[in-house]
Amino acid sequence: MAVNRNKPWLKSYPEGTPEFITLDPRKTIIKLLDEAESSYPENEAFVNFGVSISYRDVSIKSKKFAAYLQNVLGLKKGDRIAMMMPNVLQYPVAIFGALRAGLIVVNVNPLYTPRELEHQLRDSGSKAILIFENSAHVLSAVIENTDIEHVIITKIGDFLGPVKGSLMNFVLKYLKRMVPRYSLPGKINFMSTLGRPVTDLDETPSSINDLAF
């Protein structure tokens, strides 16, 4: 595949991946994921820090996360959930999970200042937020001025395995000191949200006309 100098990211595509793909405009994002899982369950879906998750992993984890959002947090179709994190493996799982639950995803720049974060949360009316621990101190400074009812914290090593994940968490927090102190009473650990049975999910049929983001 020849690489267009105006599109340098193409050189990172796996061999055989076309520059352009045609998607059926009648299919939702969740439908596309379900089809990928059905056709290529063990294929790599996402890779980060040398760790990959398959389409099956993404599908199962996203359903469990969706079940938690519905059954434990009580979020309903049309509610907003903010997501403030970089490109880590938890992000696609959370995105698909929120959409399965019928929620609207509000993406938030993880580099936002407290003032910028407060504005976006208030403007969107988000009821919940999944936030990277490195940014949690920003939220703690303004959460009282927002409608946020539920805070879910994710760490860099959550999906990197027990050894690599624990090491990454330790280095980031204690050696590089990239996790400032914060106070968010009642915060939820992201990994604990993946314990619900998939059967608990009430996956309301979605439409291409539903607001996703």
Question: In which residue ranges do the predicted regions lie?
Answer:
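Flexible, non-catalytic linker and terminal segments flanking ANL/adenylate-forming cores
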Residues: M1-R26
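Conserved AMP-binding/adenylate-forming core of the ANL superfamily
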Residues: P25, E42-K76, A82-V88, P92-F96, ...
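AMP-dependent adenylate-forming
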Residues: K7-K11, K31-S54, A212
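Structural motif
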Residues: A82, A128-L130, I152
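Structured binding elements
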Residues: G102
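Conserved ATP-dependent adenylate/AMP-binding module captured primarily in the ANL superfamily
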Residues: Y112-N145, L160
